[in-house]
Amino acid sequence: KSNPCESCSVHTSSKKRRIVVLGSTGSIGVQTLDVVRRHPDKLEIIGLAAGTRAKELLVQAQEFNVAHVALGARNTISAEVLEGLSEQVERASRSEVSGGSFSQGPDGVADLCKIPEADLVVNALVGAAGLRASYETLKAGKVLALANKESLVVGGDLIMPLAQNPGDLMPIDSEHGAIYQCLLGENPKEVSKLWVTASGGPFRGKKRADLERVTPAQALHHPTWNMGAKITIDSSTLMNKGLEVIEAHHLF
């Protein structure tokens, strides 16, 4: 399966596309950074945000020399890591027009969506917290690369009117990213039905009697993908497919 984040770089330009990654320590965020590593002539990371994995965020910020950093969590972060993040921002901010920024809490994450230098925001946040980031990104006139299902499940009627132009919003989770790429250059009026694909998770083919004895450990062991705990459970129960159908309704 191709990296879903490759769709972030489908548009060619002589100018580097400057990217903010929200949820940079999660699976989609890590994949996004891998894409940037392979296309340094086309892509540049200028902002990173994570929830609680401050040490991983610091390593990423140092590697990409990022001047804008945000942590969703306000507590439980060691003083050493906080100092390291502050020092990194100070070093990198000398070359940024708007300076640098390091903040904690949801306001800080939302502010990253409005950095003047940013061209594109990858929203790989988990849960309904991603809705505000999607809204702020589109309101600021940035391209939204969306991997956060809840933005559309919770607020599709709020988000979609802000994405009026082609390319304003690019879905990069695997199912919707695949549909998006299949429809490029096609007339939507000629499409009568869309299929949202599914691996079936770890319990595909199991009999009802087997499912009565399922353990949390089994539900957390996906046969194909290494993902976060919540999305892995949603995959095991197929709850994520319900969310994806709602998301596809708004997108397409």
Can you annotate each of these PLM segments?
Residues 21, 71, 102-105, 122-123, ...:
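General beta-strand structural signal in soluble alpha/beta enzymes
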